[in-house]
Regions:
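An amphipathic alpha-helix adjacent to DNA-recognition modules
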Residues: 10-21, 25, 30-34, 39-42, ...
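Generic structural signal for secondary-structure transition and capping sites
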Residues: 29, 95-98, 125
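Amphipathic alpha-helical packing segments from all-alpha helical-bundle domains
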Residues: 105-145, 168
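C-terminal peripheral helix-coil segments that are non-catalytic and often amphipathic
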Residues: 149-168
Length: 168
């Protein structure tokens, strides 16, 4: 692919992601259609399908982007404090509240669930023995359901208050 075509490809993908994000602010994920994305993005359906299989594929791509952003935040933080790392994650989630609220109730939730293992693997539980694996899964699921509840309630607790709940 030549440079100009590659730039056009990336530009189309950005437009699709932007339109999708705007539509998420306006309506439920299940009501967003490929046709609507294409019309709002001023692209052909074939262009959409060159990038994504369906609407959930767009959401999945957004998850990949958010997961990379979160990993970047972890790499940039030279903190070994579990509490500080959790604070950074919670702030990132709150800054991207709409995306996470939608994602927690979508088919990509299993990807999100596995993506959050970074929170627990990099700290005191390494998951090397069977008991530790159960402990890690318990903590991860409790963490995710608490985050889901927080998102469903419009992040009505401050990050610090939620951190106190999670870190007890």
């Amino acid at each position: 692919m030549n440079k100009k075509a590659n730039e056009q490809y990336k530009s189309n993908e950005r437009v699709i992601l932007d339109v999708f994000t705007r539509l998420l602010e306006e309506k439920d994920l299940r009501k967003i259609t490929v046709k609507e994305i294409c019309e709002d993005a001023h692209i052909n359906r074939s262009t959409f399908y060159n990038h994504f299989e369906d609407v959930y594929g767009v959401l999945e791509k957004m998850w990949i982007i958010h997961e990379e952003n979160m990993k970047y935040i972890f790499r940039q933080s030279h903190s070994s404090s579990k509490k500080e790392n959790l604070r950074m994650i919670l702030e990132y989630i709150k800054d991207n509240e709409l995306f996470y609220r939608v994602s927690f109730h979508s088919p990509i939730f299993s990807k999100i669930s596995s993506g959050f293992e970074i929170v627990f693997i990099s700290h005191e539980i390494s998951g090397t023995c069977l008991k530790e694996k159960y402990e890690m899964e318990f903590m991860k699921q409790g963490f995710l359901m608490t985050i889901s509840y927080w998102l469903d309630n419009d992040c009505n607790l401050s990050v610090d208050d939620l951190l106190d709940v999670i870190d007890t």
